[in-house]
């Protein structure tokens, strides 16, 4: 069941989203060669708690950290570790969530570590742009898969693959609510978008095939062919005057 949010609930989510967006902005500056993913996790947890919010990932389904840190061919759900050191030329996707006043914010970014290849930079750019292509369709009266199709069409125009095994989702009091928000599919399908829907829209894109697999830790998802992957996500409210991105602080 899709849970429609009232204006008060959306304001709570706006506040939670601001903390998530600012956390990611802080982490982008901190993500440099020589830093470990555990360092980033500690910074994120401290930052979120400073604003009296709760890191929503920590303990979720047994996940051991406050952020997901996925490097290069890792797509999502990478576990921070003191043994994972960032190196010049890496790319890292950081997924972050926070709870404030009982409501969630969820977002992800992919960062460059020092100087990166042209291919990696293009992948990050296209993944981010595909999110905004999807958001253009996140308007009242459209169907859910209008978002999905717009993302897929844009990504595939560059020859990249759109991950299909993992999708975006509704969000509110719970991190994962209905509906699922695929990043692929035919337009004009799924529920009609209405005022008060809040969605986590999150294209996951790789340079090669869209096929992925899960590593032996049962969390980290990687590309099957070892190609680079990127992830970009925001929490988006569907409002009468158009979509509002709740986790974007630029």
UniProtKB/Swiss-Prot annotation:
GO terms for biological process: proteolysis. Belongs to the peptidase M24A family. Methionine aminopeptidase type 1 subfamily. This is Methionine aminopeptidase. GO terms for cellular component: cytosol. Binds 2 divalent metal cations per subunit. Has a high-affinity and a low affinity metal-binding site. The true nature of the physiological cofactor is under debate. The enzyme is active with cobalt, zinc, manganese or divalent iron ions. Most likely, methionine aminopeptidases function as mononuclear Fe(2+)-metalloproteases under physiological conditions, and the catalytically relevant metal-binding site has been assigned to the histidine-containing high-affinity site. SUPFAM superfamilies: Creatinase/aminopeptidase (SSF55920). Its EC number is 3.4.11.18. It comes from the Bacteria. It holds the Pfam family Peptidase_M24. The keyword 4Fe-4S does not apply. Its cofactor is Co(2+); Zn(2+); Mn(2+); Fe(2+). Removes the N-terminal methionine from nascent proteins. The N-terminal methionine is often cleaved when the second residue in the primary sequence is small and uncharged (Met-Ala-, Cys, Gly, Pro, Ser, Thr, or Val). Requires deformylation of the N(alpha)-formylated initiator methionine before it can be hydrolyzed. A divalent metal cation 1 binds at residues 95, 106, 233. It catalyses: Release of N-terminal amino acids, preferentially methionine, from peptides and arylamides. Keywords: Aminopeptidase, Hydrolase, Metal-binding, Protease. It is an enzyme of class 3 (hydrolase). A divalent metal cation 2 binds at residues 106, 169, 202, 233. Substrate binds at residues 77, 176. One of its GO terms (molecular function) is metal ion binding. Monomer.
């Amino acid at each position: 069941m899709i849970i429609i949010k009232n204006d008060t609930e959306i304001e709570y989510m706006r506040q939670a989203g601001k903390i998530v967006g600012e956390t990611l902005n802080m982490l982008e500056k901190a993500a440099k060669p020589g830093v470990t993913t555990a360092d980033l996790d500690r910074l994120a947890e401290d930052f979120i708690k400073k604003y009296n919010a709760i890191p929503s990932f920590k303990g979720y389904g047994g996940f051991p950290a406050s952020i997901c840190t996925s490097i290069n061919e890792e797509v999502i759900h990478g576990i921070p570790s003191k043994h994972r050191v960032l190196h010049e030329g890496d790319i890292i996707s950081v997924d972050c969530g926070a709870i404030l006043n009982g409501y969630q914010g969820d977002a992800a970014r992919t960062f460059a570590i020092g100087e990166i290849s042209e291919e990696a930079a293009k992948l990050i750019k296209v993944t981010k742009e595909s999110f905004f292509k999807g958001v253009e369709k996140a308007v009242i009266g459209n169907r859910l898969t209008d978002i999905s199709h717009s993302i897929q069409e844009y990504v595939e125009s560059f020859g990249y693959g759109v991950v299909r095994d993992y999708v975006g989702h509704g969000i509110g009091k719970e991190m994962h609510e209905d509906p699922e928000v695929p990043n692929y599919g035919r337009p004009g399908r799924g529920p009609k978008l209405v005022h008060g829907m809040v969605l986590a829209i999150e294209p996951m894109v790789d340079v090669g095939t869209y096929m992925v697999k899960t590593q032996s830790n049962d969390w980290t998802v990687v590309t099957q062919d070892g190609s680079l992957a990127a992830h970009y996500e925001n929490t988006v409210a569907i409002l009468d005057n158009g979509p509002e991105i709740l986790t974007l602080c630029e």
